[in-house]
């Protein structure tokens, strides 16, 4: 359904940009592409954003379906940005090395977020799907909810069991895993699941 990455190509058939950065000072933007090895051409961003604050405004979908992630619009919960949108992440806050090459991940703080409310070919109801992502295991909080996956398509909490996303953090409102966390849990709307039920899973 989607393939999002700011660090590298995920599909050999994709030849578009990985993500877009926008400068706070003048609103100018730049699409960051991949180099010949498939890694993000971070030098483009560094030059464009020199002496300026840049934010990631689009994470392009590499699946070919056009399910790009953009600034999350207001829904059940309003964001802190203009128009009650979510904030956009600062573009250089998550540098990481990939095979000796500096690239940038996405550093999400409370109030930041992306969405795609018109995604194509989503899994519906109990249709099968898989979710795979790479995160910084040291970056998390206890709030609800830092998710990635197949969420509702209108930004609203529309009912129990209407999402299929993955959560990473130490929230214990619905359940928890073994030890002090953080834990990977499934956020299906109105509940974080560590196993079959929303409760302690000490496996």
Model-inferred region functions:
Residues 1-83, 125-128, 132-134:
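GGW-centered surface loops in extracellular recognition modules
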